[in-house]
Amino acid sequence: MATRGGPMVAGTDGNDFEFRQRVAGTYQISLLNKSRLKYCIFFHALLFFVMLAKLTSDILDRLDIFVLEIEELEVPSPLWWEYVWAGSLLTSFLGLSAARGNKVREMQKYMIAILVFAILPLLYCFAYYFSDVWEFATMDKSVELDETDIFIWRGYPYGVFWYAFCFVGFQVHGFTLYFAYNLVKVWKARTATRKFQ
């Protein structure tokens, strides 16, 4: 240990620690993508609560619980994809577990689960409401919404609400897959380097 003002090792000015105290690039990339993946999972949870608010009416009906304020909203009955998408939040535990332990196989399973339980239901929603949204987007200004075949809820086209949800959902799940893929790539490279050594 050197003391301040004490003898200095010949050939160095004391700044050589800058070259020795670097974190490997793969660890930095892994840490950055883990952090971003956790943010994506957080936004997935926020979207889940939006979906849960929509599903509350149907869930309470199935449990035979009557709440006047919720019934007055006249929320449309949910489709199957809404429940499948809501269940996709459970896959987040798999992703968090994989990120915590740097487990390549579990992260790959998480990516497949997000694709099947989150992105495919959103694609179905996108296709299901396409005709309503297209008709709304291309209709004349002089035509009233009530005169069309567009499904209306609270004075607005119902499909437009779902398109907004899908837009945010595609972004969240797209970034989730991107960060998970980056983690898998880095972890595989790191294990390949260990095997090579």
From Swiss-Prot:
It is found in: Endoplasmic reticulum membrane. It is a multi-pass membrane protein. The chain crosses the membrane at residues 40-60, 79-99, 110-130, 160-180. Keywords: Developmental protein, Differentiation, Endoplasmic reticulum, Membrane, Oogenesis, Transmembrane, Transmembrane helix. Residues 1-39, 100-109, 181-197 are cytoplasmic. GO terms for cellular component: endoplasmic reticulum membrane. It comes from the Eukaryota. Signal peptide: none annotated. Required for endoplasmic reticulum organization and proper vesicular traffic during vitellogenesis. Required for oocyte and bristle growth. Belongs to the jagunal family. This is Protein jagunal. It comes from Drosophila pseudoobscura pseudoobscura (Fruit fly). The gene is jagn.
